[in-house]
């Protein structure tokens, strides 16, 4: 531990090395610009100035300082590579790429929309009156409804109609059965049995 502290004091940070001064333990640049990042500090010093950088470090929360210094170093390097535009050149380039991608996306969406074919609805053939009579549960086409949806009263009327139709059919069947039974009984009384075993 003692060796590490002595090595830290004996090796100046990039800022103190650039300024040719002794690096102390309370140096604000040492944690963020070690001797291995001399190029970064020189770029930051050239663009922003040492006093402004020191003021910025002291004004920030300790947990924000490292990220802020990395950002300044990146901006300074970009400014050194493109003195005219700096960071704005990268921003404009990214915005141009976004615009190109949005235009390409719109073209692709239009092409996909041209392949989407909406199927045409073909209504089923209407039933004849005879077919509707044979199927009492079928709702007649002329039945008024609200946009194709039956109301509760209409459903009740249709149920009553179906019940009355079924009742009429059952009564008609019973009458036919009674009539046939009556005919058979009359024939028996008139002609008697074919054979008399007594």
From Swiss-Prot:
Taxonomy, superkingdom: Eukaryota
Domain LOB: 11-112
InterPro entries: LOB
Pfam families listed in its UniProt record: LOB (PF03195)
Similarity-based family: Belongs to the LOB domain-containing protein family.
Name of the featured protein: LOB domain-containing protein 28
Species annotation: Arabidopsis thaliana (Mouse-ear cress)
